[in-house]
């Protein structure tokens, strides 16, 4: 998936990469597995994609977020806003150092619903 995403980014304006692992861990109610799957995604997909696109002359925007909120306590999908990260050359980072539902709310964008998130994303 990582290789395919990078190849498509070379000639497409938008690439959507969907990974199910952390959602399944939420359904299982396994917080340790959910953390491990997110760390694995960072090491095997997000990190390599970020490292590669930083070297490109054409800027690329990266957004990282789940497709829905699946709290391990509830083990079901809920309609709450999800934590997200947006990276683009020139965006000044905020003070958030952890990727989780509580920390991301304190970030520069706060809590956004889908329409608001897409409006922000399309600025880049």
Model-predicted segments: where are they?
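Feature captures the catalytic ectodomains and active-site-proximal regions of enzymes
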Residues: 1-124
């Amino acid at each position: 998936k990582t290789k395919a995403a990078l190849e498509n980014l070379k000639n497409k304006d938008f690439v959507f990469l969907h990974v199910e692992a952390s959602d399944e861990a939420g359904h299982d109610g396994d917080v340790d597995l959910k953390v491990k799957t997110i760390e694995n995604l960072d090491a095997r997909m997000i990190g390599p994609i970020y490292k590669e696109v930083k070297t490109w002359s054409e800027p690329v925007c990266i957004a990282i977020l789940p497709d829905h909120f699946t709290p391990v306590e509830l083990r079901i999908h809920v309609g709450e806003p999800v934590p997200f990260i947006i990276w683009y050359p020139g965006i000044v980072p905020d003070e958030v150092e952890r990727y989780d539902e509580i920390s991301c709310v304190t970030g520069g964008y706060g809590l956004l619903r889908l329409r608001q998130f897409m409006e922000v994303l399309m600025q880049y």
